[in-house]
Amino acid sequence: MSQSTYTLQCISRAVAFMSEKTRDGKTPDLEAIATAAGLSKYHFNRVYKLATGETPQETLTRFKLARAADQLRDHEVSVTDAAFAAGYGSSQAFAKALKRVLSASATDVRIDHERLGNAIETLKIPQSRGEGSVSIEIAKLEPFEAIAIRTDSAYPALNERYWALFEAAGDPAIVEAILGQPYGDIGPDNWNTLRFDCSLKLSAPAKTYPENIVETQIVGGLALLKRHLGSYDHLPASIDDLYHATLCLKDVKIAEEPLLFHYLDDPEITAEAELRTDVYLPLVA
């Protein structure tokens, strides 16, 4: 089975799962959707967006709005009841979502039957988006040890963590690589829940480190590699290129491991436009 076929089957399972849950008035979280899809929770959000043109949250919003809008066909059902039936906590939350997606109020669509029908059909279809270009190679990483500081909800403000790692390393000459691993989507919408490991590969590790620094194993193996050039703020675009490549390559599958960033330049002495970051997407061997 090709990766594109496998991924589309996973996406289909995710869509079916979300559809079923929203019909029951429930709103599953991202991890539950990824589990139902059979895709790594670390990569699911962006893979789903590339395959469908929207995020899982946007799909859930469409499904919930479609269910609520369908309820509005019945004039015996209040807007509040329609909102609760679709999984919204209040009629205000439903009204805001409807206004954002359709630029209309519940009253507007309810009194205009044609508009209501068009709204329901619109909510069934994701909005199309463009795709980026792809410049990818396959690499093999040997396993290695690193020292790391694990953070939660700190990305992208990580400078102090890396300074602490360099201080613990002692001699800058023994630093072989500056690394990072995001355990999820690094898009701004996810910063408040993102775990991110800041790490260094050293040629001569110390015997002991401060309590906030742990020794960790980078598992290595096959990976898709793209060299990102420019601001770290634009890393998501290069990550999307890697995920897009998995849809085009035959017989590759994303591993249950986080992305690996290898920061090749010092941002204090390198112009932002010239910063190089090697981005690795681990694959199942």
Locate predicted features:
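DNA-binding recognition helix and immediately preceding turn/loop
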Residues: 3-55, 71-91
